């Protein structure tokens, strides 16, 4: 495994341990060059309460690997999380830098009503 990926996974592990200690519901984000995924996971880590990604039929028709798509996923995850009764989450960026698509998703989720 290359050094860049190892560093990302180390950061992700540290973040997840901190969130688990808080006992908070988390908004977990993962990205690939082509898609972006978001899940709201319960505080015990055992249940996915809401999910959204660029693979959803409503978002799949457009481009899927850019900031615009991440903004749409952020708005969709906020809507689905609120429908599941979740308004406050801890943001788990999975070790990715808070920049670009990750930042766009987080900003859209905040505008949609989620509290970080």
Swiss-Prot record:
**GO MF, one annotated term:** 5S rRNA binding
Biological process terms in GO annotation: translation
InterPro entries in the record, alphabetically? Ribosomal_uL18_bac-type, Ribosomal_uL18_bac/euk
Looking at the keywords, is Ribosomal protein present? yes
Q: Which SUPFAM superfamilies match?
A: Translational machinery components
Q: Which UniProt keywords apply?
A: Ribonucleoprotein, Ribosomal protein, RNA-binding, rRNA-binding
Q: Name one Pfam family in it.
A: Ribosomal_L18p
Question: What cellular-component terms does GO give this entry?
Answer: cytosolic large ribosomal subunit
Name the source's superkingdom.
Bacteria
Q: How does it assemble?
A: Part of the 50S ribosomal subunit; part of the 5S rRNA/L5/L18/L25 subcomplex. Contacts the 5S and 23S rRNAs.
Tell me its family. Answer: Belongs to the universal ribosomal protein uL18 family.
Primary role: This is one of the proteins that bind and probably mediate the attachment of the 5S RNA into the large ribosomal subunit, where it forms part of the central protuberance.
Q: What is this protein called?
A: Large ribosomal subunit protein uL18
Organism this protein belongs to: Acinetobacter baylyi (strain ATCC 33305 / BD413 / ADP1)
Q: Gene encoding it?
A: rplR
